Amino acid sequence: MGMESSPESPQPVRVVLQAVGGWIGRLGRIWIEGQVAELHRRGGMAYITLRDPVANVSARVTCSIRVLRAADPPPEQGARVVVYAKPDFYVPRGTFSFQALEIRHVGLGELLARLERLRQALAAEGLFAESRKRKLPFLPGVVGLICGRDSAAERDVLENARRRWPAVRFEVREVAVQGDRAVPEVMAALEELDAHPEVDVIIIARGGGSLEDLLPFSDEALVRAVAAARTPVVSAIGHEQDTPLLDYVADLRASTPTDAAKKVVPDVGEQWELIRQLRDRARRVLEGGIAREEAWLASMRSRPVLANPVQEVERKIEQVFDLRDRGRRALTAALDRAGDNLAHIRARLHALSPATTLARGYAIVRRADGTVVRSAAEVAPGEELRLRFAEDGLVAIAQNREEDEL
């Protein structure tokens, strides 16, 4: 039940804090998990700041040195532990803490199992899909580098990258790469470099270490931040056998910081060699083409027609004249044949013409209606007839019919 109070009848601080202490006391003893962010020993007591493994939340834990030493080996800063503790609320100061009764290290097998469950969950969301990974630029203008302060990883990346491409530029952000400050500092550096207008690719690099040392690079919040980045990210954490979750979400995984430098910038010597090879190949192709054309020209030049072109022209002229004469003869013969044929046809037409028959003394006899009379039997005495001769005609009257005396 809530405490009764009003502006006129408020509850004293001690009463409220005592009530809060009572509520907390009723929680009982519980197991909690976290990472040791700070550890101080004073007298016979140990004071621990325990950080949540995912969220930026921490709590104060106190225990005796005996309890601390019982967790063989005693945990140090950065260790992942589970604590059996009793919640405690100190009323005089209004502070909350846990009184640890037992501390245990999180086992390697349990850590690996949790990481695998997280990996599967993130993979199911599509954060590790190859389709969302971006290609690195061939020659980045500026490379962002997130690494430990004065670390071997930083030296490896810078030295190898500059050896390969001396003109490469870097924006370096030195951060904590293990412990409770690693995740927030790496995320802050990532956000800053991702917003940098000249940075074309970001390398997150760290040397080798134990599974616990590399845990920050399997942090869910960091993995999601890398997935959301607009700039391509290269993961170069630990050695080749180390595989934090950052390797899965990064656009490219490098086995070591040195390998990251090799994958991010090209080798100037290799590029010069490639240019030389391409230049030589182009020269060979060009020279081969010229040689083929020269051979073709030589073969054309060696042909007889090109050795004495006037002779070939004269030969063609003779062929033209010969064809002209042949055509003329053929045309003349055809015209002669056509003339003879026409004369023959004219003679036949003349022989068959009625005018020719009339010229030999014959006449055509017609009645008054124009019908031709073919026999005297067709004419009645006294009938008017019209006679047509070769050049003129006359009108006659039939009198008597005579028998043919021929």
UniProtKB/Swiss-Prot annotation:
Its EC number is 3.1.11.6. It holds the Pfam family Exonuc_VII_L. It catalyses: Exonucleolytic cleavage in either 5'- to 3'- or 3'- to 5'-direction to yield nucleoside 5'-phosphates. Disulfide bonds: none annotated. Coiled coil: none annotated. CDD domains: ExoVII_LU_OBF. It is an enzyme of class 3 (hydrolase). GO terms for cellular component: cytoplasm; exodeoxyribonuclease VII complex. InterPro entries: Exonuc_VII_L, Exonuc_VII_lsu_C, OB-fold_nuc-bd_dom. It is found in: Cytoplasm. Keywords: Cytoplasm, Exonuclease, Hydrolase, Nuclease. One of its GO terms (biological process) is DNA catabolic process. Signal peptide: none annotated. One of its GO terms (molecular function) is nucleic acid binding. It comes from the Bacteria. Belongs to the XseA family. Heterooligomer composed of large and small subunits. PANTHER family: EXODEOXYRIBONUCLEASE 7 LARGE SUBUNIT (PTHR30008:SF0). Bidirectionally degrades single-stranded DNA into large acid-insoluble oligonucleotides, which are then degraded further into small acid-soluble oligonucleotides. NCBIfam families: xseA. This is Exodeoxyribonuclease 7 large subunit. It comes from Thermobifida fusca (strain YX).
